[in-house]
């Protein structure tokens, strides 16, 4: 809905995620509880 949210790492840290970073075909969306693989990168704030 908002185009951004947070992903929780295995150790419980929350990481900001913007929809533009989602690499998939079709509609870029994630569901609560969905398992994903990701790399943490520093970006502009």
UniProtKB/Swiss-Prot annotation:
Chief place where the protein resides: cytoplasm
A Pfam entry, by short name: CSD
Signal peptide: none
Gene Ontology terms: cellular component: cytoplasm
One Gene Ontology molecular-function label: DNA binding
Induction line: In response to low temperature.
InterPro entries: Cold_shock_CspA, CSD, CSD_CS, CSP_DNA-bd, NA-bd_OB-fold
UniProt keyword Methyltransferase, yes or no: no
PANTHER family with a match to the protein in the record: COLD SHOCK DOMAIN PROTEIN 2, COLD SHOCK DOMAIN-CONTAINING PROTEIN 4
Protein name (Swiss-Prot/TrEMBL): Major cold shock protein
Originating species: Streptococcus dysgalactiae
Lineage of the organism: Bacteria, Bacillati, Bacillota, Bacilli, Lactobacillales
């Amino acid at each position: 809905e908002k185009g951004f949210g947070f992903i929780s790492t295995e150790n419980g840290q929350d990481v900001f995620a913007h929809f533009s970073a989602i690499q998939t075909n079709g509609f870029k969306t994630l569901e609560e509880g969905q398992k994903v693989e990701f790399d943490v990168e520093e970006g502009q704030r």
